[in-house]
Each structure stands twice: as structure tokens, then as C-alpha cells.
Amino acid sequence: KTADSIIKNYSAMLNEMHSEQEELLSPSQFKLAKTRILIRIALYRSIKNHTKGEDALAHTKKYFYAKVKAASKLVKFAGKSELGCTLFRKAFSYGLRADTWISAIKKNDKESLVFDITKCLYKDLCDFYKCPELCMMFCDGDWLAFGDMEKLKFERKYTLGYGDELCDFKFTKQSR
């Protein structure tokens, strides 16, 4: 009975979020919000309506981290070869041009890709829906996605989701 109620609440909440954000976001921002962010926020808030906040967060993290691990297989595969690393770097730097971030590339050559993000749609939407703890989950997901590549080392000291002024991404070529 609780599961049915959560699912019903989730669907209604997600539809409401879609209607709300479609008017506020650009088409590219809305596409990312719809496919990657709002589904997690709606899930979390729906579970939270039926259980304690920390339990809702634990369930949402478990679901999200499983999805990230599955998706990270392609990144890990790309990170096994020189060509894959080059393609990863080019694709990532291209993606940074989207209006879902405000970013500054500090270095992009065959040795490394280093950039800062000072505005992020994930953070903006988590703040909008008053769930900053979920933004930390999204930030932590980067470690699952990028933390175990053979030829590229991922480093980051700061994240917007943890209250810092920026997210500092650094991918450095390494020999293993």
C-alpha cells in the first residue's frame, strides 16, 4: 500500500515539476532536468513524504548510485585507451558549452582537462526544491562515474553541492 502511494505521489510530483520547469528553463536545460535531475528529486521527495528523511535519502542514493555505476561502464571503457581518453576529453569539453553550466576551461590538452563550474543546473534545481542533501548525492556520483578510469585520473577538491564556490574538475593522463 505504501509503495502504491509513493508511486502515485511520485508521478503527480514529477508531472508538476515538469510543468513548472518547462516554463523556467531553456529547452536544453529542461531536457537534462527531465531525464537526469527531476526524476531523482521527485523520487526522493515522494519517499520522504512516507518515511524519515534519512531513509528516503538512503533509498534514493542506492537507486541513483546503481544507475551511475551502470552508465559508468562506457566512461571506464573510454578511459582504457589513448583514443578513448581523447574522445572523452573532446566530448566533455563540448558538453561544457551547454547552458546547463557556467564553466571555465583552464586547461585542455593531451595531458589533462581542467575546468571549474560556478553554476550548475543540478545545484539550482536541488536548491529550488529545497533538497540540498540531494545535490551532494549528485556530486558524489561523479566519483562513481569517473573515479576508476585506467588512463585518466579524476580529482576534485571542491563542489557546489557541498557549499563551495565552485566545482573544480581535473582529469589527468596517467600511466598504469
Where are these regions (language model features)?
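N-terminal, charged low-complexity regulatory/assembly segments
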Residues: 1-44
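Glutamate identity and glutamate-enriched acidic tracts
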Residues: 16, 20-23, 54, 82, ...
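Short, flexible segments with low predicted structural confidence
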Residues: 15, 117-119, 140-141
